[in-house]
Amino acid sequence: MDKLSGSRPRLGPPLPPPRCVDSPGWREDAPSPSFLPAPGTWRHKAQEEDEEENKYELPPCEALPLSLAPAHLPGTEEDSLYLDHSGPLGPSKPSPPLPQPTMLKGAVSLPVAGKQGPIFGRREQGASSRVVPGPPKKPDEDLYLECEPDPVLALTQTLSFQVLMPSGPLPRTSVVPRPTTAPQETRNGTADAASKEGRKSSLPSVAPTGSASAAEDSDLLTQPWYSGNCDRYAVESALLHLQKDGAYTVRPSSGPHGSQPFTLAVLLRGRVFNIPIRRLDGGRHYALGREGRNREELFSSVAAMVQHFMWHPLPLVDRHSGSRELTCLLFPTKP
């Protein structure tokens, strides 16, 4: 052996000497020079660490029965609510009885429960946030629409804003006193009487006008220059046949006999000038020419007008050439 050991190099550390039972260096109670601790030392250290962890987690253990312990109990209302949000509902299986937890398991499960607590709280807040902003006050609006209005307010609105309110049956219309037929009849009688009086008062004013026109017509029929039954064509033909400057005649107007009942026709230089005669103030005055003149002369009758221009020149304006000429009424003509 010595030769073999001397010839080959020894690998690894030197072997320990053989163990002797009687040797004091190998007794169990003697300290061992080995680097590995004894089994008892590991147990002691584990117990110390457990005690330290238990001491560190003691404050959460006191608050555990108040808020977190009911969240993990099966069969409670909170547990069913939590399961409703976490996953689909299914047939609940009876859970086996839980064994009595040791100090180590309680210490280990405390952080898990502490972590699950805020999750449960956040889910409750999420559920509450989904429930609170739900339908935006539809029941209040429906209730407001179904509520009957105050009769005083409804009556005031219907009396003051009838144009804006839609036509329809108003609530409690019996409050509004309906007018009787007697005032309406009296008002109708008053209106009829007023209209009759107005017609009676207007009749005298019309009668003088009619009588004045009748008297005027009777006076005109006796005049040598009035052509009562002739139209424009007949009058112009008669004047052109005469061929005298200053020949004239008065005829009824071709249009409706309103404010221009007559027309004065005058011949000058081979042309016939037709000038309207206007009636003013209900037949009390007459004017020659169309409206809008700056200066016009008023006459009491058509005969007074013809007599005036028999001695005063009458200005005549040609519409085509714009030339202006003067002439007097010299030759009365009657077709």
UniProtKB/Swiss-Prot annotation:
Residues 1-139, 166-215 are annotated as: Disordered. Keywords: SH2 domain. GO terms for cellular component: cytoplasm. Pfam families: SH2. Residues 91-100 have a biased composition (Pro residues). The keyword S-adenosyl-L-methionine does not apply. Signal peptide: none annotated. Residues 225-333 form the SH2 domain. Residues 1-10, 63-74 have a biased composition (Low complexity). Transmembrane segments: none annotated. Residues 202-212 have a biased composition (Polar residues). It comes from the Eukaryota. InterPro entries: Immunoreceptor_sig_adapters (IPR051751), SH2 (IPR000980), SH2_dom_sf (IPR036860). SUPFAM superfamilies: SH2 domain. The keyword Protein biosynthesis does not apply. This is SH2 domain-containing protein 6.
